Regions:
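Conserved small/polar residues in nucleotide/adenosyl-binding loops
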Residues: 248-253
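Structured alpha-helical segments in the cores of large, soluble enzyme domains
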Residues: 189-201
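Acidic/aromatic-lined carbohydrate-recognition and catalytic surfaces
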Residues: 2-187, 198, 209-247
Length: 253
């Protein structure tokens, strides 16, 4: 564990309801910057910022439309960079909430994945091989895209599940975790992490970290392997970055 994390006292912020600086009735990143002294006086030395990426907000920001863009209601990417810098000047670390299990149906990846023509994103999400196929026990949506298939959901209709593969494949449209499609999804998540770490954030709290691989073992063998892979990348490239995974315990391989 990182030394700073051992001594961290977190203040959790849902930006929308925290502090509004422009009078639109919605909290924003500038509001967090203005209240850093207040947070410091409370004895907190770390922030956990709930979902703040671009989203249609059908599920409070847990339906991400663009992982590399701050939601306009909260500000801009420049505001995020300013927040990281202002927090660091006061010895406060900042974690962003990352939702890697699914995206919004409005995400550019999903729009490409929904096309009938094979492309880079065809396997970014979990699709059956026919618009009449059920989801092998999982919730699914069919008949809403040009692609001949139904797509698997994680929660609501607006949240198509990203494809990290299956621990046990029971249908021909299911892919093992080491197939090119699932591996590309993992690399895409690493790319998102690098983007924000390079901007100055100190790591991520990961929502529903156990939900990545479908038909996983009881102890989440395959999902844990993905997180060990991502953690190894962080340890190598960003040794001070924190990775806090919700609802999962990574056991030894």
């Amino acid at each position: 564990m990182k030394q700073w994390l051992k001594d961290a006292v977190f203040y959790e912020i849902y930006p929308q309801s925290f502090y509004d600086t422009n009078g639109d009735g919605i909290g924003d990143l500038e509001g967090i910057i203005e209240k850093l002294d207040y947070i410091k006086e409370l004895g907190c030395n770390a922030l956990w910022i709930n979902p703040c990426f671009d989203s249609p907000f059908k599920d409070a920001g847990y339906d991400v439309r663009d992982y590399k863009l701050i939601a306009p209601r909260y500000g801009t990417n420049a505001d995020a960079k300013a927040l990281f810098e202002a927090a660091h000047a006061k010895d406060i670390h900042v974690l962003l909430d990352l939702v890697p299990g699914h995206t919004s149906e409005e995400h550019a990846w999903f729009k490409e994945s929904s096309k009938p023509e094979k492309n880079e994103y065809s396997d970014r999400y979990i699709w059956t091989d026919s618009c009449f196929s059920a989801g092998d026990g999982m919730p699914f949506i069919g008949g809403e895209t040009d692609r001949n298939g139904t797509y698997i959901l994680n929660f609501f209709k607006c949240q198509p599940a990203l494809n990290y593969g299956y621990g046990k494949c029971r249908e021909k449209w299911q892919m093992p975790t080491d197939a090119p499609g699932p591996r590309a999804t993992v690399e895409a998540v690493k790319d998102v992490m690098r983007f924000w770490l390079d901007m100055g954030c100190d790591g991520f709290r990961v929502d529903m970290a156990s939900s990545l691989v479908k038909n996983d073992t009881h102890h989440k063998k395959y999902t844990c392997a993905i997180w060990r892979d991502i953690a190894a990348m962080l340890d190598k490239e960003y040794p001070e970055a924190a990775l806090l995974l919700s609802l999962i315990h990574i056991s030894e391989p």
